[in-house]
Amino acid sequence: EGFIRRYINDLQTRGKYMVCCNDGTKKMNCPERRRDFRQPVSVTTIKDYDKVENIIWYKPQAYPYYANSRSYVLPYIGVDSYGNAWLRLVFHYTGDSWIFFKKITVSVDGQNYVKDFDYFEVSRDNGSGDVWEYVDISPSTTDINMLRAIAASKETIVRFQGDDYHYDLTVKSSDKSAIISVLDAYSLL
């Protein structure tokens, strides 16, 4: 809640908080809703500015800095210089053995969501004795609903499934909080 409150206060302070454009539509690029993209979304996010693409990426503080830190499922937000925002979603495995996952099953309190990937959709790398595999996607409405279910769940297990191996990740409560914070902030953009 503090994440959202600070974000709304940030927008209201500049007089740029509007629910819709004057013509009644909800657009990211109408002048009334455009916000200064260089201003922070929240102090609870990590801001990464891409000077070449002129995009700011906002990631929750729970987002690992190093690729081989831990496995996770987390969304993040991109905002361009025109104030247009979009959501991204990362499924990330790291460990000491390759999974070569092609499928992810997310079990949210017993309800399963399944995502299939082609071999080349998954990025893979290694270093310092660790391996990591991940996909970074534009989430569908179903994916966003799944993220909300994860955040509200008692237990969520994410299975990274390959042909011969799999890895089960239990989503931490800190990641659940990060998920809902990012989704709530995104819904205000």
Predicted regions and their residues:
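A generic "folded-domain core" signal
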Residues: 3-18, 25, 29-189
